[in-house]
Amino acid sequence: MVKIRPDEISSIIRKQIEDYSQEIKVVNVGTVLQVGDGIARIYGLDKVMAGELVEFEDNSIGIALNLESDNVGVVLMGDGLTIQEGSSVKATGKIAQIPVSDGYLGRVVNALAQPIDGKGQIPASEFRLIESSAPGIISRRSVYEPMQTGLIAIDSMIPIGRGQRELIIGDRQTGKTAVATDTILNQKGQNVICVYVAIGQKASSVAQVVNTFEERGALEYTIVVAEAANSPATLQYLAPYTGAALAEYFMYRKQHTLIIYDDLSKQAQAYRQMSLLLRRPPGREAYPGDVFYLHSRLLERAAKLSSQLGEGSMTALPIVETQAGDVSAYIPTNVISITDGQIFLSADLFNAGIRPAINVGISVSRVGSAAQIKAMKQVAGKLKLELAQFAELEAFAQFASDLDKATQNQLARGQRLRELLKQSQSSPLAVEEQVATIYTGVNGYLDVLEVDQVKKFLVQLREYLTTNKPQFAEIIRSTKVFTEQAEGILKEAIKEHTELFLLQEDK
């Protein structure tokens, strides 16, 4: 029989007592009263914050949005099919945040920054809040560097600068996404990080955009945040903020970023759905009262940072869809008042074969020529004026039968200028090519051609310049000025190419 030694037992007990520590963990817990339509009503959770993440028994997550006297309204980030009435909910003490890193470049993620492209996990050591405050007045400086879109109509007449917010607005099927994606394609080699946020779109449309980026080598500097039309309203509402948080990560590291929200009408609809289900009082068009704040707090995060903060920038191109060209609806007027200008795309122009279908008359950039290089300012000044006069004359010419020679010449010039603005999708032009194209048009070198020859002539002229006069592009790129030497080279090239072209056409 083993002899029990009291001193050994007492030392074991003493050790156990010394090692004992009493941990008190306070968890804020509530009970599900009701669940359905992506909304849960919770009893309890007394100390929950507005916007705090809460965790259900099935490990699904929700956001506490409505804090009422007797219950908490939570929006779910999933379908909520496994959440049962009476089950417990605990507050996490965290506000929605996402991991951020350089590893996100070239990836497709959802609104929670989780990869959905099947290429494995994304390594990240840093986190950013999805909703963070915008830079203040002292943290910013005025916009002065151009953000080239590669589209002649925009870069010459509605220029966009780094740190600007420019709205792209138009009816469905007018080429809004095409303008935005062309801008991303044009950032190749410009050292700009692009974020494309797809909200409530068909998954097939997003796949098409991602394929275009991949084929053109644009995916390596782009992050795609996608929430398809079948995603819960909560995730469609969060997606733009996730995109902004990813872009901010790069902006505060002294880099230039471009973010596209495609489109904010769908985000507003998702937010309206959530608000109505939470029984918040509806306002105009049944949107909640704070729908303006929904977009203003998002778009104010776009900025050009001051030199103390490293001069990084975040340029935002929000897209808004109109119904039958009605720009005076609630969401369009809200976003127009928040942004620094708008590019208006017209269905009539699109159907008339003018693509990109930009209505230059009512499109505007509130940054203006500050966002253009000197060479572009030198050649583009006359373009907008001549097009405006042409639009006026064209309306008048419909009623007048006999027009004098000067008016006929002006109409002919206007038709050729309008032809000059046409561009194929996914073929953005470098700024030196744009300068050459505009100069050719406004100085009457296209007047000798038929209208249907203009596009072909300009394509060939740009090729001719690249192969035979590479010094022209070099001067514009290095000096950013349309010098007398550059003008001389261009005039010579136009003269030589016109002779060749007319000989070809006569055969």
UniProtKB/Swiss-Prot annotation:
Q: Which organism is it from?
A: Physcomitrium patens (Spreading-leaved earth moss)
Assembly state and interactors? F-type ATPases have 2 components, CF(1) - the catalytic core - and CF(0) - the membrane proton channel. CF(1) has five subunits: alpha(3), beta(3), gamma(1), delta(1), epsilon(1). CF(0) has four main subunits: a, b, b' and c.
Q: What EC number(s) does its UniProt record assign?
A: 7.1.2.2
Q: Does the keyword Secreted apply?
A: no
Q: Which Pfam families match?
A: ATP-synt_ab, ATP-synt_ab_C, ATP-synt_ab_N
What keywords does the record list, in alphabetical order? ATP synthesis, ATP-binding, CF(1), Chloroplast, Hydrogen ion transport, Ion transport, Membrane, Nucleotide-binding, Plastid, Thylakoid, Translocase, Transport
Gene3D superfamilies per UniProt: 2.40.30.20, ATP synthase alpha/beta chain, C-terminal domain (1.20.150.20), P-loop containing nucleotide triphosphate hydrolases (3.40.50.300)
- Catalysis: reaction(s): ATP + H2O + 4 H(+)(in) = ADP + phosphate + 5 H(+)(out)
In Swiss-Prot or TrEMBL terms, this protein is called: ATP synthase subunit alpha, chloroplastic
Instruction: Give residue numbers for the site Required for activity.
Output: S363
Name the job this protein performs: Produces ATP from ADP in the presence of a proton gradient across the membrane. The alpha chain is a regulatory subunit.
Q: Which CDD domains match?
A: ATP-synt_F1_alpha_C, ATP-synt_F1_alpha_N, F1-ATPase_alpha_CD
Its GO biological process annotations read: proton motive force-driven ATP synthesis
Gene Ontology CC annotation, any one: chloroplast thylakoid membrane
Q: Which GO terms describe its molecular function?
A: ADP binding; ATP binding; proton-transporting ATP synthase activity, rotational mechanism
Q: Where in the cell is it found?
A: Plastid, Chloroplast thylakoid membrane
Give the bilayer topology: Peripheral membrane protein
Name the gene.
atpA
Q: Known PROSITE patterns for this protein?
A: ATPASE_ALPHA_BETA
InterPro entries for this protein: ATP_synth_asu-like_sf (IPR023366), ATP_synth_asu_C (IPR000793), ATP_synth_asu_C_sf (IPR038376), ATP_synth_F1_a_nt-bd_dom (IPR033732), ATP_synth_F1_asu (IPR005294), ATPase_a/bsu_AS (IPR020003), ATPase_F1/V1/A1_a/bsu_N (IPR004100), ATPase_F1/V1/A1_a/bsu_N_sf (IPR036121)
